[in-house]
Curated annotation (Swiss-Prot):
Annotated protein name in UniProt: Poly(A) polymerase catalytic subunit
Function: Polymerase that creates the 3'-poly(A) tail of mRNA's.
Pfam families hit by this protein: Pox_polyA_pol (PF03296), Pox_polyA_pol_C (PF12629), Pox_polyA_pol_N (PF12630)
EC number assigned by the record: 2.7.7.19
Keywords for this protein: ATP-binding, mRNA processing, Nucleotide-binding, Transcription, Transferase
Active site per database record: D192, D194
Taxonomic classification: Viruses, Varidnaviria, Bamfordvirae, Nucleocytoviricota, Pokkesviricetes
Source organism: Swinepox virus (strain Swine/Nebraska/17077-99/1999) (SWPV)
Reactions it catalyzes: RNA(n) + ATP = RNA(n)-3'-adenine ribonucleotide + diphosphate
Subunit structure as annotated in this protein's UniProt entry: Heterodimer of a large (catalytic) subunit and a small (regulatory) subunit.
């Protein structure tokens, strides 16, 4: 045995390492030494400040926090499973090397906020948004309860923390969804804060530890296999606290965004296209029937922003939108005619099965596909004047061979996402797709073409049980 390494392991384990422990853990001695020399007093002080600033309503004494921290950092002393020791080392290493920069910094005085608040009065466009939403109320309500609807009592505290986090880390974390619209229109209500960031795993692990040390409760991180790079944090009752999509830094830099009070939000034009896409998802149409007012105010806010900032004239002239689309039932591929716009492609093949798209791209021997990850939920490839891409939502039919207008518009919006993200020509097709929303024909759904089934196992990080499977 190397005496220096053995001493580091002995100091960490509180016992002299067995031969098996030495040989399996010696590769981790640098990380273990970081844990050994970690200043727990300063860390406990940061936790107390975090608790005072963001969780002041929770009953927890300073001695409770200290006891919880010291108990966790001595956990390895009574652990003999090599697998569990590896998990403890990994989680402790993340905590001691990242917490101060990720969450601890939120307790210090932040930079001055440069007020850039832009409030939008939606009164003039709310009638249009109401008509649009009512035209989409064409489904019956399902009794199915989605898991994320079970909201933790900690959401309010975490939201307060997230507002500060978004300001401090606005180069690698941005928000979208209802909170971002609330910043544009205070009448928009929000639940949790939807975020995209480049270090989701580290952030959520640090947040899980913060909650554990303050509340004493075990929280669990889940990775969902059918959502790319998505993680959700759940409390001890399996209730939703916060979720996050992880994206690459180059994707972050590609996303158009606007700054409001030091917080970056995804440009509402991108969010509007994503909303039009989502309307093609059958369970989202069911949500509209349950609570149309919620969708109306969000849609109106997006429409008003885009109308003003992109100079859209609402006159009902929708040109070629939604674009002509035909569906091949056997191949599960939609062909979209795009040659009427100034796009770098003349037509588009929309695949409903992602694996089939990947296979066909491979056969094309083309290596210039671009993937915007969760922003578009698909890669895009342009080859020989044809775009190849994947559509992740259900497709609605109005007859056996005719795609419902809600879905043709959703497909068109998916194509416009590419144009927006690549800074291509957008004004005319954007004007057309928005004007196509005026005087929508309310049409029943003949059939729903299901989206492809994603397989895989949930990953989990459980601090209490020393489990990491992703």
């Amino acid at each position: 045995m190397n005496r220096q390494i053995a001493n580091i392991l002995e100091n960490y384990l509180g016992r002299y390492p067995s031969l098996n422990e030495y040989h399996t853990l010696k590769s981790q001695y640098r990380n273990i030494q970081k844990v050994n020399i970690f200043n727990k007093d300063i860390f406990i002080s940061l936790l107390r400040k975090n608790k005072k600033k963001f969780f002041s309503d929770l009953v927890c004494t300073q001695s409770d926090i200290k006891h919880s921290v010291l108990s966790y950092f001595s956990k390895q002393e009574n652990t003999y499973s090599i697998g569990k020791l590896y998990t403890i080392i990994e989680l402790q290493t993340i905590l001691v090397t990242t917490y101060t920069d990720v969450l601890g910094v939120l307790t210090t005085k932040g930079p001055d906020i440069f007020s850039s608040t832009i409030y939008y009065n939606i009164s003039s466009i709310k009638k249009l948004a109401t008509d649009i939403v009512h035209a989409m109320m064409i489904t019956t309500v399902s009794d199915k309860i989605m898991g994320r609807h079970n909201v933790s009592s900690l959401v309010g505290n975490v939201n307060t923390l997230m507002e500060e986090y978004l300001r401090r880390h606005n180069k690698n974390c941005i928000c979208y969804g209802s909170y971002s619209l609330h910043l544009l229109n205070p009448d928009v209500r929000y639940g949790d804060i939807d975020i995209l960031q480049t270090n989701s795993r580290t952030f959520l692990i640090d947040l899980a530890f913060l909650i554990k040390f303050i509340t004493g409760y075990n929280v669990v991180l889940l990775k969902v296999p059918y959502l790319k790079n998505y993680m959700v944090l759940k409390d001890h009752n399996d209730n939703h606290i916060i979720d996050s999509f992880n994206i690459r830094q180059d994707t972050m830099e590609t996303i158009p965004k606007i700054l409001i009070d030091n917080i970056y939000i995804v440009d509402p034009v991108l969010q509007l296209m994503s909303m039009l896409k989502m309307f093609s998802q059958i369970d989202r149409l069911e949500d509209i029937v349950k609570n149309p007012d919620k969708v109306i105010i969000r849609l109106a806010t997006l429409l008003e922003y885009v109308r003003i900032n992109y100079g859209i004239i609402l006159n009902g002239d929708h040109g070629n939108m939604p674009m002509l689309s035909t569906f091949n039932h056997d191949q599960r591929i939609i062909t979209v005619q795009t040659n009427m716009y100034n796009f770098p492609f003349k037509k588009c093949f929309i695949y409903l099965d992602e694996n089939t798209l990947s296979r066909d791209i491979l056969h094309l021997n083309a290596d210039d596909a671009v993937d915007f990850e969760n922003v578009s939920n698909s890669a895009y490839l342009i080859h020989n004047d044809t775009m190849y891409t994947y559509f992740s939502n259900t497709i609605l039919l109005r007859s056996e061979n005719e795609i419902h207008e809600i879905s043709t518009r959703a497909i068109s919006a998916h194509i416009l996402l590419y144009q927006i993200l690549t800074k291509g020509d957008i004004i005319q097709p954007l004007s057309d797709i928005i004007n196509s929303l005026i005087s929508i024909e309310k049409c029943t759904i003949y059939k729903v073409i299901q989206r492809d089934k994603k397989t895989g196992k949930h990953g989990i990080i459980d601090i209490e049980k020393d489990i990491i499977t992703h």
